[in-house]
């Protein structure tokens, strides 16, 4: 049974659902430059981090789609991983679905709404820096 599972993972069926998903996404994003596609990957990962805070869980769900999508859109896989890492990183500072954040705020007796008021400018600076980093990565072929 284990060999059959490995064979299925290594050689997916010709008409796998993932192929349909990849085709649809790539057609929707076909006119974008590599830089714009990479930035959209970052934005998607940042938003997705709200729903799946776990970095490894997020990678397991999104990277099987993001890595081949990067290939189709002319973005290196390294840059797609960078977009994933940055998208997973900074939004952890504000997402209310993060147990670590909410637990830390509870111990410090800080309301989440007050935390957002305090953090939004800093998070904006971090996100602008992340976009610049991604654009540089695309420009140098990282």
What are these regions (language model features)?
Residues 88-89, 93-142:
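Juxtamembrane and boundary regions of transmembrane helices in multi-pass small-molecule transporters
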Residues 77-78, 112:
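Alpha-helix N-cap/start motif
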Residues 5, 25, 29, 33, ...:
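Structural signal for hydrophobic packing residues in well-ordered secondary-structure cores
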Residues 66-69, 80, 104:
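Extended, hydrophobic alpha-helical segments in both membrane/secreted and soluble proteins
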Residues 1-7, 78-82, 130-139:
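Hydrophobic alpha-helical transmembrane segments in multi-pass integral membrane proteins
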Residues 5, 9, 33, 60, ...:
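Membrane-interfacial segments
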Residues 40, 44, 48, 62, ...:
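Hydrophobic faces of alpha-helical transmembrane segments in multi-pass integral membrane proteins
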